[in-house]
């Protein structure tokens, strides 16, 4: 099975010069916690999660009205291709400890593959579960008081 058979197509993307307030509103409108960031030519410039907004901006007193997506997004994004085998994509997810792969064709965003897509479709459920367990590490809050 190939990535194109499972990926989500026609996805919303952010621009690098959007503010994180715009990004948060877009995430809320689409009920998602992660969005690819694309240049005007459609090439993937990065990926932004709701956690990036909180940890890389708000927790550092960043102003959501002026902080730009490009300043807090993850750059050098690992991507998949539509014709890639699902097992190869799972390996990329697990090896790189990530949960989502933007899917590109000719360097242009065409979709996104999330580990949840595989699990909810019962595709390679054991492999997806294994990959998820490899990328998920127990969270240990730092200096948490009761």
Predicted feature locations:
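Tandem CBS (Bateman) regulatory domains
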Residues: 1-10, 49-79, 85-94, 114-146
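N-terminal first-folded block
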Residues: 8, 12-36, 44, 48-49, ...
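A glycine-centered beta-loop-beta connector
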Residues: 27-30, 35-51, 93, 101-116
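The conserved cystathionine-beta-synthase
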Residues: 13-31, 38, 80-97, 104
């Amino acid at each position: 099975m190939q990535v194109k058979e499972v990926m989500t197509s026609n996805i919303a993307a952010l621009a690098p010069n959007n503010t994180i307030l715009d990004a948060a509103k877009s995430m809320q409108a689409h009920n998602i916690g992660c969005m690819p960031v694309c240049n005007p030519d459609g090439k993937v410039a990065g990926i932004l999660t709701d956690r990036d907004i909180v940890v890389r901006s708000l927790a550092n007193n960043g102003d959501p009205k002026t902080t730009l997506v490009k300043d807090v997004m993850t750059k050098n994004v690992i991507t998949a291709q539509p014709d890639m085998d699902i097992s190869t994509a799972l390996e990329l997810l697990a090896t790189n400890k990530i949960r989502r792969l933007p899917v590109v064709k000719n360097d242009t965003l065409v979709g996104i593959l999330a580990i949840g897509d595989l699990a909810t479709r019962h595709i390679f459920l054991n492999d997806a579960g294994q990959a998820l367990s490899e990328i998920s590490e127990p969270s240990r809050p730092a200096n948490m008081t009761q």
